[in-house]
Amino acid sequence: MPNEDVLVGPVNNANQLARVKGFLDRVPAHARVTAGGTAINRPGYFWNPTVVADLKQDDEMIQNEIFAPVITVQKFTDEAEAVRHANGVKYGLASSVWTKDHGRAMRMAKAFDFGCVWINTHIPMVAEMPHGGFKHSGHGKDLSGYGFEEYTRIKHVMTNLNA
């Protein structure tokens, strides 16, 4: 039964909670935490939804997957710069595009080097579609028929039965 006072579930374990805290402890002086930034005082591994703004492209929080309710915000002047920021990381699991301009959303989704791109939403998962990352975010796909194919190796064998 759902707990009505929980809006965001916990991170996976104590080590992950400590890892998230470490990222927030190391926020550079030029950046600012605009929301959250702390663990929730309750049983479990809960972290307050957190927004960190004014980060630079080479900052640790931009260049790593945090796996927590933490979002980083960077300014950009045009689509090309936004795509450079997004793709300028070694990971590529998932991304989101938020805009009222559907054409822009589709251009950016095409340009983003991520295994999953959500438009005007984040984290919906359906079993009919594959899920998996690009670059250092892993290999292969989960869910759907594509996930099954990750456990197979196709081999083509031909023989001459008259020999």
Residue ranges of model-derived segments:
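Structured catalytic cores of enzymes that bind and process phosphorylated ligands/cofactors
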Residues: E4-V6
